[in-house]
Swiss-Prot record:
It comes from Rattus norvegicus (Rat). Keywords: Acetylation, Apoptosis, Cytoplasm, Nucleus, Phosphoprotein, Repeat, RNA-binding, Tumor suppressor, Ubl conjugation. A motif (Phosphodegron) lies at residues 70-76. The keyword RNA-binding applies. GO terms for biological process: apoptotic process; BMP signaling pathway; cellular response to lipopolysaccharide; epithelial to mesenchymal transition involved in cardiac fibroblast development; negative regulation of apoptotic process; negative regulation of cytokine production involved in inflammatory response; negative regulation of DNA-templated transcription; negative regulation of JUN kinase activity. The modification Phosphoserine is found at residues 25, 67-68, 71, 76, 78, 94, 313, 317, 457. SUPFAM superfamilies: ARM repeat. Residues 163-284, 326-449 form the MI domain. Induction: Up-regulated by apoptotic inducers. The modification Phosphotyrosine is found at residue 152. This is Programmed cell death protein 4.
Length: 469
């Protein structure tokens, strides 16, 4: 407070001669008995005193404002304000001292980039500037001969057995989805397989044994394309040796593993990635029953191929790669075999083996056609049970079921030419399917029906017309 009062007196000095005009003179302060002579408008405070009080209050506000603004910069008035006021020099924090100050008034810039050299902030030199290759100075005290002509190369550590299986399993599973052997070859080149190259066919065949026929066909193509680029024929032979050795364990998860491995061996010999004498080298030296069964299967297939059968047909073409005519024949044979054996689970298994879920409407269509063409009740009942089983197991979806019925509805006029009672049989079969929950009410109502023709002698209601003559 003493500093502030001292600043107020120095900034706004008052005349000592006019002290008598203030609120209290020196005598009144000591004695307190002398009256004030100057009275204006009935007030006991002089006009000059009021003006001085206003000036002092304004100076205080200005000083307090400047002090709070510059408190963060270490140049507050509390530190050096008293010396500046005594010396009569305007402090930098005062308005007069800040006129030539180029710093921001608000403590922030205008948002413009700083000039960090040519080009401004965040710019690497002037536009068009070309950087030369840094040359090593031989006379530099820190010069090292090893710094010249250095070639850097990424070193990939070889995979161990655990990392090998964890890395290659997703690659092969993705290959079963896209079927691009070149992509698999590029990914394997980026890995340092080392001595684990022979493990690639072992892992691929092991995964294919648990998959479908199309997966096994894709695995055979993959082995044929990788041989010579990623692995050699010796690696392929080592891999099949390990497969024959591990057959007892593989047969626990896949009972058909010996026959399937034999087919892989026959296909590999046919593709030229295994030598023709590979099977002969095992004659008389195999004690394992599963390995002997695999070699016998391969021998039979190779002997059949010599008679003219292509080795490419070991697995067949599965999935959507099969022609439509072939699929129609397979479904027709499937239904006829089911009518003879009555084995519903085998029919469902054969349908899944075709791997054509987008073509299941053909089975619905062919099944209903067989019902319309049959003369007994056995086909009617068996086909109804088959469709009901396939529907409950979600083997045939609602879209495929609907499409099969719609095909029958559209072709029933042509079918009726060969089967006169097809309309009545179809109405009965559709009603039974609706009662079993196979089709919806909307699909049932779409079933076409042909009304019975009235004879000329029949009137309305089936009565005979009276004679008009």
């Amino acid at each position: 407070m003493d500093v502030e009062n001292e600043q107020i007196l120095n900034v706004n000095p008052t005349d000592p001669d006019n002290l008598s005009d203030s609120l209290f003179s020196g005598d009144e302060e000591n004695a307190g008995t002398e009256e004030i002579k100057n009275e204006i408008n009935g007030n006991w405070i002089s006009a000059s005193t009021i003006n001085e009080a206003r000036i002092n209050a304004k100076a205080k506000r200005r000083l307090r404002k400047n002090s709070s603004r510059d408190s963060g910069r270490g140049d507050s008035v509390s530190d050096n304000g008293s010396e500046a006021v005594r010396s009569g020099v305007a402090v930098p924090t005062s308005p007069k001292g800040r006129l030539l100050d180029r710093r921001s008034r608000s403590g922030k810039g205008r948002g413009l980039p700083k000039k960090g050299g040519a080009g401004g902030k965040g710019v690497w030199g002037t536009p068009g500037q070309v950087y030369d290759v840094e040359e090593v100075d031989v006379k530099d005290p820190n010069y090292d001969d090893d710094q010249e002509n250095c070639v850097y190369e990424t070193v990939v550590l070889p995979l161990d057995e655990t990392a090998f299986e964890k890395t290659l399993t997703p690659i092969i599973q993705e290959y079963f989805e896209h079927g691009d052997t070149n992509e698999v070859a590029e990914m394997l080149r980026d890995l340092n397989l080392g001595e684990m190259k022979s493990g690639v066919p072992v892992l691929a065949v092991s995964l294919a044994l648990e998959g479908k026929a199309s997966h096994r066909e894709m695995t055979s193509k993959l082995l044929s394309d990788l041989c010579g680029t990623v692995m050699s024929t010796n690696d392929v032979e080592k891999s099949f040796d390990k497969l024959l050795k591990d057959l007892p364990e593989l047969a626990l998860d896949t009972p058909r593993a010996p026959q399937l491995v034999g087919q892989f061996i026959a296909r590999a010999v046919g593709d030229g990635i295994l030598c023709n004498t590979y099977i002969d080298s095992y004659k008389g030296t195999v004690d394992c029953v599963q390995a002997r069964a695999a070699l016998d299967k391969a021998t039979v297939l190779l002997s059949m191929s010599k008679g003219g059968k292509r080795k490419d047909s070991v697995w067949g073409s599965g999935g959507g790669q099969q022609p439509v005519n072939h699929l129609v024949k397979e479904i027709d044979m499937l239904l006829k075999e089911y009518l003879l054996s009555g084995d519903m689970s085998e029919a469902e298994h054969c349908l899944k083996e075709l791997e054509v879920p987008h073509f299941h409407h053909e089975l619905v269509y062919e099944a209903i056609v067989m019902v319309l063409e049959s003369t007994g009740e056995s086909a009617f009942k068996m086909m109804l049970d088959l469709l009901k089983s396939l529907w409950k197991s979600s083997t045939i979806t609602i879209d495929q079921m609907k499409r099969g019925y719609e095909r029958i509805y559209n072709e029933i006029p042509d079918i009726n030419l060969d089967v006169p009672h097809s309309y009545s049989v179809l109405e009965r079969f559709v009603e039974e399917c609706f009662q079993a929950g196979i089709i919806s009410k909307q699909l049932r109502d779409l079933c076409p029906s042909r009304g019975r023709k009235r004879f000329v002698s029949e009137g309305d209601g089936g009565r005979l017309k009276p004679e008009s003559y």
